[in-house]
Amino acid sequence: MHQRSWRTLIAGGAALAVGVTLTAFGAPAHAAGVPGITSEARAQDEVMNYAVNLTADASHYDFNAAVSKASENGVVLAQYPEFNTFFVQSVKASFAPTLGKSLVDAGISYQSIGPTRFKTVTGDEVRTEQPQTTASEANAVADAAGTHTTGLSADSQLNDFTPDEGDANAWGLTAIGAIDAEQVDVTREKVTVGIMDTGIDPDHKDLKDNLDASRSVGCQVNGIPNQDPSAWKDDHYHGTHVAGTIAAAHNAYGVDGVAPSATIVAIKTSNEAGSFYPEYVACAFDWAAEHDIDVTNSSYYMDPYAFWMPNEASQAAGLEAASRAIRYAKNHGVVNIAAEGNDNDDHDNPTIDKESPNDVEGAAVERNVVGGIDVPAMLNDSVVSVSALALPTGTDPATATLERSKFSNYGKNTVDVAAPGSRIWSTLPTWKKDPPFGYLSGTSMASPHAAGVAALIKQIHPDYTPDQTIALLKKQAGYTYDRLAVPEDGKEYRGAGLVNALAAVLKDQPQPVVGNLEYSHDGATDWRPLADARVSGTVYVRTTVYVRTTVSGPVTKASLQVGDKEPVTGTGTGAFTGNEVTLVAGPYNATGLISDAPHVEVTVTAEGRNNDTRADDDVKDSIHFHVDESLHDGGAWTNSADGWKYCYSDGYCARSKYVTIDGSTYYFNGDAVMATGWVTIDGTRYHFASSGAWLG
């Protein structure tokens, strides 16, 4: 499990407060804290959840003191000291300004305090033990606790998704090469994908074997983790559909996922009404960071605002809390993938929103959202944002030029990659449909294609950081960038390109690294660099192949060949750590290595973990060394009819070589005759004296 950090992982809180009217507080008797953005008192007593974000430099002591003060007027919910955020439920109308004053008076600075939603907290989320000092407060708590939501709210974002009928055709898998990728023979390490959604059906035959119930959780009651299976079981169908696209098993049933051997974890992030509130989102990302989740998928926008305004007092705290949690997850090893959204909006330039707030029917108003943030899609420093693609009618998904789905949001600076999102065939809950499969459309369906590819990359590169994984995801998407239609309407949606499952398992593979080639006269001591060396007598040649810990990747097999001698081979485990192969070739007599070539070639071949011939994981390295013939026993000058030669007792005469004799260098041509005068050797002119000694 990842270790928690006390360091706050977000900065710039003071900048967010510019231009905001803050509640005026009386002067304290000691050094005051600095107030942040604070929501106004509510019109009446009603149960509400609040996000409280202290400043980045708040101490552990300040955090605990702030929690204590908040508990005086409410019930403290989830606490995240690792990024200085906590949530509180209170019935008191003046909770936010009252807590703000209390913190400032105590010398505690904060970034923001404000509600997490528009709708009053009701039903199972109401904490009746909270402080109640008036009849108005008591009545508000009782009324809220007695009100229960059944089914989706009228304006829930999940109402956009209705399963379509049709023949099974998971065209998206073909388009990104996932079917071919599944057949590549390569070792895949364990990887876990967290599905932040409406839950997962644990009984689905295509999902249950890949589902890790021990790490699954529900965050939809005040953002407090609950691992009871009833808390994370899908109560819609959206989450089950997303899960199937990512990791439906390869089991001769239904459909395959992009990464069919990945483990999935349900992280239920929506409530029964279909709302994804900030406290749920913070819970989900913190859970991923603390439970060894490698990749997350977020196919939603954070309710109740399509765009959250950083300087709006009713929205700043919820936005800040979620942003901190998402950044915390990334900084703790999690690759976060998110859907761009389905409003045909320019995410580079948000202007008008008519959908928010969406958790109370009829409450939405038209508002200016310039500078607003769609969470999590527009948090590009912490997530990979995915646009949706459509397959033109009658085309082959393996080769077709794909188009932007008409509903997909877009933006040159906000879209990271593109993936199939229109009419995507995947799993549905067993209680929803028989057989439990169907089509859905949306960027919600595109994002899991990208999450599946990210999972494949992590299976191949288990030691990659999120930044490395994302960089490779984008690089490989660029290999098929030309399969995306140029947006003639100016709505740039392509990002780095089309996510590429096949490239994830064939290209940019981890490679073994070949260590220094050395030689020794006794095979045990005094190993010296071999490249371009001049050696004589009896020599050993050695090389060591190191695994990733030294530079890069693992080795499964290696060979070392000296000249035309029989190669020496060895095998490795393919593990990324603790795996090296040492090869020692020899002993060889130097005279026995002499040939017509001017040098001896040494070749090392190292094979990686991928057995597919198309993969780029194997390494071949060659160097040369020279045999210094001047030190060979029996060498002597011989004057032949063709000229002077230098021959040995075994009858061999130096040819096509430079030889140093008694301190002077001579060159002997292919006929073993000593060169004199000007001679062209390998395209270069050299000058030798009449005695044969090299002049330059």
Regions found by a protein language model. Give the residues of each.
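Active-site core segment of subtilase-fold serine proteases
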Residues: 146-261, 283-286, 290-317, 346-350, ...
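Autoinhibitory propeptides
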Residues: 32-40, 64-167
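Extracellular S/T/G-rich loop segment that most often corresponds to the catalytic His/Ser-adjacent loop
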Residues: 197, 334, 362-459, 463, ...
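Secretory targeting and sorting signals
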Residues: 1-31
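Substrate-binding/access-modulating region of protease and related hydrolase catalytic domains
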Residues: 269-378, 431-448
